[in-house]
Amino acid sequence: MVRRGKEPAKGTLDLPGGFVDMDENAEEGMLREIKEETGLRLQKPQYLFSIPNLYEYSGMTIHTLDLFFRLDVEDDCNATAADDAADAMWLPLNKLDHTQFGLHSISQAVKRFLSENR
């Protein structure tokens, strides 16, 4: 996870991610955003689910469809905060609390993932 370094929801927990560029598919965009925010180079994303969202950006409300993927990482991966992430960290599933995630769709996704994987 990362701690958001910018608004909206600055200072709250988040999952690394962002917007897909015009020449990317969802998987490519997600892998690029994770690399930009954490330095991690990951592969083989497994699609989980999507959640419709309203995202506040530059004074505008943008309708988005947030896509969630599961990625497996090596035990010795070190994430480093970069781009718009203020901090990057690993937390065990049993320490996650969906209410610590400041963006509604992310909070709902974490809640759903935890209910399906505990």
Q: Which residues are covered by each model-predicted region?
A:
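Unchanged
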Residues: V20-Q43, N53-H104
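N-terminal strand-loop-strand
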Residues: M1-D14, L42, V73
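Charged phosphate-binding loop/patch that engages nucleotide di/tri-phosphates or the phosphate backbone
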Residues: G102-R118
